[in-house]
């Protein structure tokens, strides 16, 4: 049985798509090993079928500290790969992949890199010259070296299986000013559970890097929104830290808004299928999931994201009329409230965005697996 190594770490945005790819490759008869770092250890579940290896590389701004750490990590990775004898190594970008990718190059193991964002990251750009193929999610990608263009294959991003099981069902008029809306129902469900036809549900989450800003901005925006449209029936599903939830619950209760909170949503499919609109960061995996199911979103890019890639992701979607980008440095509770009210009051805008999202959907788990099989 041929062995394939996947390398991803740092955040859930890198981790979960790589796991989804691993599951597809296992179905095709490969033995899949996954090298990740300590930060992603929390995401490992017993029912995941890939074989995990923890290889941590701590970041440091001091080159004299980082180089010895990198050297040790590379030696460990060389030993690991030498014993495995993989047919290919696939890296998803970010500094946690550096040591395993160097090890693969040293051992002459073919490498493939996958860039999830619309901006080629520093690590992927460095390894581009060594890669057999470069898989990308967006047809338009910034920061791509001229020499790498011949290696490019557009595969789209990889979406988790439980999200892929969702399908879009056209619903008739829901009775609110929102008119016809889309309800996301699990493919295996035969009966649509009844819900309040007038209820507009907003799903708010900040990803694995946290949502502290949202715990302050969103409640303030909802207060303004309800002042402008008191008859609006809202349901809020929101990621929030425990110490923020009491304060937010008090605000929503006074506004007569139904709500659901969690520090982290383990099964996003359950929340996606209830939502009419998402407010989130603009990480690549989030965008791929929303694209796959045609769920429109207001994106507030994380300013500290490497190379400002979240801004480029969100701006590209806005240019394609598939989402809306509000920069954190320029946003206010009033601006966000106005945008939400505009979308609720003009359902055609939401519906068009949903259709545009579905047009750019790709079966990334299959396309990337096909590419890997070509290289092996």
From Swiss-Prot:
Its main location: membrane. InterPro entries: GlcNAc_MurG, Glyco_trans_28_C, GlycoTrans_28_N, RPE4. GO terms for molecular function: UDP-N-acetyl-D-glucosamine:N-acetylmuramoyl-L-alanyl-D-glutamyl-meso-2,6-diaminopimelyl-D-alanyl-D-alanine-diphosphoundecaprenol 4-beta-N-acetylglucosaminlytransferase activity; undecaprenyldiphospho-muramoylpentapeptide beta-N-acetylglucosaminyltransferase activity. It is found in: Cell inner membrane. Its EC number is 2.4.1.227. GO terms for biological process: carbohydrate metabolic process; cell division; cell wall organization; lipid glycosylation; peptidoglycan biosynthetic process; regulation of cell shape. GO terms for cellular component: plasma membrane. Keywords: Cell cycle, Cell division, Cell inner membrane, Cell membrane, Cell shape, Cell wall biogenesis/degradation, Glycosyltransferase, Membrane, Peptidoglycan synthesis, Transferase. The keyword Lipid biosynthesis does not apply. It is a peripheral membrane protein. It catalyses: di-trans,octa-cis-undecaprenyl diphospho-N-acetyl-alpha-D-muramoyl-L-alanyl-D-glutamyl-meso-2,6-diaminopimeloyl-D-alanyl-D-alanine + UDP-N-acetyl-alpha-D-glucosamine = di-trans,octa-cis-undecaprenyl diphospho-[N-acetyl-alpha-D-glucosaminyl-(1->4)]-N-acetyl-alpha-D-muramoyl-L-alanyl-D-glutamyl-meso-2,6-diaminopimeloyl-D-alanyl-D-alanine + UDP + H(+). UDP-N-acetyl-alpha-D-glucosamine binds at residues 11-13, 117, 160, 208, 310. Pathway: Cell wall biogenesis; peptidoglycan biosynthesis. Cell wall formation. Catalyzes the transfer of a GlcNAc subunit on undecaprenyl-pyrophosphoryl-MurNAc-pentapeptide (lipid intermediate I) to form undecaprenyl-pyrophosphoryl-MurNAc-(pentapeptide)GlcNAc (lipid intermediate II). Belongs to the glycosyltransferase 28 family. MurG subfamily. This is UDP-N-acetylglucosamine--N-acetylmuramyl-(pentapeptide) pyrophosphoryl-undecaprenol N-acetylglucosamine transferase.
